Regions:
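Charge-dense, helix-prone N-terminal extensions
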Residues: 1-100
């Protein structure tokens, strides 16, 4: 999945708006983070902790949690390796969590 495809998908969800910079765009719903591009291959996504663990188990090559994020509702998606459907699923989880 490319950064442009991430943006197109995220912005297709109701209420999602793009913020950030050209190099590091971020997508928010109700001013709450859904996802943020760290670099062209790494996307940080807000995900509820129980769902994050399931995502990591199902897709260990495409997702990870660096030590600095372990206590947070976040996961990194490695866009060159992650299944596009799993990335969309994670974005959906973030959108559901943040729109409440």
């Amino acid at each position: 999945m490319t950064p442009d495809e991430v943006g197109q998908y995220a912005e297709s969800l109701p209420g999602v708006r793009r913020k950030g910079t050209a190099d590091q765009p971020a997508w928010y719903v109700r001013d709450r983070l859904v996802a943020r591009l760290v670099d062209p291959q790494t996307l940080v996504i807000r995900v509820p902790l129980p769902r994050r663990e399931a995502l990591l188990e199902a897709h260990p090559d495409g997702f990870g949690v660096p030590p600095r994020m372990e206590a947070h509702h976040k996961v990194e998606a490695y866009l060159s390796r992650a299944d596009p459907g799993a990335v969309r699923e994670a974005i959906d989880l973030a959108w559901e969590m943040q729109r409440r």
